[in-house]
Structures are given as structure tokens and as C-alpha cells.
Amino acid sequence: MANMFLMFYLSMIMFLFGCMVFVSNRKHLLSTLLSLEYMVLSLFIFLFFYLNFMNYETYFSMFFLTFCVCEGVLGLSILVSMIRTHGNDYFQSFSILQC
């Protein structure tokens, strides 16, 4: 029982560290995407242990992972298209209003 609460707290601390990295590193798109994936991983750990603690089925965690993979693929496709058009992944090197 105490081990389960330790995992809850660990996943929340992981999420907070991911949020801090996301807020502090805003220059590169790749570091932003990595911090978002770290936050998603900590949410998955929290969700998995919560569903096991409440004796629910863990099918929802599979749906969550499916959508997380889709989010990661979309982020990587934006990164690749940005590197092809601008040559780097700096946010300061291009205008957001430009099509």
C-alpha cells in the first residue's frame, strides 16, 4: 500500500519536472517535444498505477498510449518539415505568421 503511494508521488514529481523543463527550454522544438513526451510518460505511469490500485481494467491505458504515439508522430512530422524549410529547429529563426 505504501509502495503504491510512493509511485503516485514519484509520477507527480516526474510530471512537475517535465513541466519545469517545458517552460524553461523554449528555444528548440526538439527539447520541447522531448519534455512533452516525458510528461506523457509520467502521466501514463500515474494512470497505470491508479487503474491497478482501483482494480479497474487497464484497457484505457492502451488507448492513452495510442493517442500518445499519434501525438509524438505529429510532433516529429512538424519537426522534420520545419528543418526542411528553415534548416534548424530554433523558434526565433522563423515567423509563426508566415505560411
UniProtKB/Swiss-Prot annotation:
Transmembrane segments: 4-24, 29-49, 63-83
Subcellular locations according to the entry: Mitochondrion membrane
Domain of life: Eukaryota
Catalyzed chemical reaction(s): a ubiquinone + NADH + 5 H(+)(in) = a ubiquinol + NAD(+) + 4 H(+)(out)
Record flagged with keyword Translocase: yes
Family: Belongs to the complex I subunit 4L family.
Function comment: Core subunit of the mitochondrial membrane respiratory chain NADH dehydrogenase (Complex I) that is believed to belong to the minimal assembly required for catalysis. Complex I functions in the transfer of electrons from NADH to the respiratory chain. The immediate electron acceptor for the enzyme is believed to be ubiquinone.
GO molecular function: NADH dehydrogenase (ubiquinone) activity
Chief site of localization: mitochondrion
Entry keyword set: Electron transport, Membrane, Mitochondrion, NAD, Respiratory chain, Translocase, Transmembrane, Transmembrane helix, Transport, Ubiquinone
EC number: 7.1.1.2
GO cellular component: mitochondrial membrane; respiratory chain complex I
Any single GO BP term: ATP synthesis coupled electron transport
The protein's name: NADH-ubiquinone oxidoreductase chain 4L
